[in-house]
Amino acid sequence: MTQGKLSVANKAPGTEGQQHQANGEKKDAPAVPSAPPSYEEATSGEGLKAGTFPQGPTAVPLHPSWAYVDPSGSSGYEGGFPAGHHEHFTTFSWDDQKVRRLFIRKVYTILLVQLLVTLAVVALFTFCDVVKDYVQANPGWYWASYAVFFATYLTLACCSGPRRHFPWNLILLTIFTLSMAYLTGMLSSYYNTTSVLLCLVITALVCLSVTIFSFQTKFDFTSCQGVLFVLLMTLFFSGLLLAVLLPFQYVPWLHAVYAVLGAGVFTLFLAFDTQLLMGNRRHSLSPEEYIFGALNIYLDIIYIFTFFLQLFGTNRE
């Protein structure tokens, strides 16, 4: 059956007519019905080869910010995977995803070390009465730590050179973490031990939930920079108002509102900074900015803890 199909398909068109004309026979021979076209003939056509299908729009592979300059000026990754065109991605796209996963792993490793150091300092200042009494009796160390924190933060946030070059980036981040841990530990020393532990648990649950939600949701928090800026300015001026009113009169409900606002704002900033690591949002961080990524998320978590401490904490007697 296959041989017969191939013999009919391979027969040149018009061969029978030429044989009849050569023998002088016209319209005497019965017409032979044409065989159905073969698979090769049916799938072949103009502009298409046999066995191929028409190509859709070419998918653009992802590019890291250090290998691609975005004309619009936004850094990082753009757009994610276009739906329905995964087969068009080149090997570079998958390599790029490996770079992004390595970047996220590096950021959270650094963040884990920062949080463990801070937790150790907070535990020392909370449970050790000798250390607690010393830091409360010497507030000068607090202001010195605040100055170191502010200087290292400005250096890491504003200067890309020290932030990207090893080992200066790790040295600055270590100094920054130790100073911030001292500030957090001293603040915790004024609160009851049970309150500190409760706020630690609440902070851990909130941060874990926000992180999982930020990785799973399709909502792009990185496109809400304007809203976050307005909320941050509201928080800033509310803090100034409290600083002015505090020497004259302490208003508990106003302080509670400020703590709720602060915890909410930095929870949103935690979602924003988490999605900056992912690379498939409107804005994202370069894989070289692992120090900056860890710095932002660490600050968000510390600020959430301190605002929860102001909201739920009980002062020591």
Swiss-Prot record:
Any GO CC annotation of this UniProt entry: endoplasmic reticulum
This protein's UniProt keywords: Apoptosis, Cell membrane, Glycoprotein, Membrane, Postsynaptic cell membrane, Synapse, Transmembrane, Transmembrane helix
Tissues where this protein is expressed: Brain. Highly expressed in cerebellum, also found in cortex, olfactory bulb, and hippocampus.
Membrane topology: Multi-pass membrane protein
Domain of life: Eukaryota
Record-annotated disulphide pairs: none
Sites carrying sugar chains: N192
GO biological process terms, semicolon-separated: apoptotic signaling pathway; cerebellar granular layer development; cerebellar Purkinje cell differentiation; cerebellar Purkinje cell layer development; cerebellum development; negative regulation of apoptotic signaling pathway; negative regulation of extrinsic apoptotic signaling pathway via death domain receptors; negative regulation of neuron apoptotic process
Reported phenotype of the disruption mutant: Mice show reduced cerebellar size and internal granular layer (IGL) thickness in early developmental stages, delayed Purkinje Cell (PC) development, with an abnormal morphology and reduced cellular density, increased caspase-8 and caspase-3 activity in PCs and higher sensitivity to Fas-mediated apoptosis.
Start and end residues of each stretch annotated as Disordered: 1-54
Pfam families assigned: Bax1-I
Localization: Cell membrane; Membrane raft; Postsynaptic cell membrane
Quaternary state and interactors: Interacts with FAS/TNFRSF6 and BAX.
Family of the protein in this entry: Belongs to the BI1 family. LFG subfamily.
Annotated function: Antiapoptotic protein which protects cells uniquely from Fas-induced apoptosis. Regulates Fas-mediated apoptosis in neurons by interfering with caspase-8 activation. Plays a role in cerebellar development by affecting cerebellar size, internal granular layer (IGL) thickness, and Purkinje cell (PC) development.
Name of the molecule in the record: Protein lifeguard 2
Encoding gene per record: Faim2
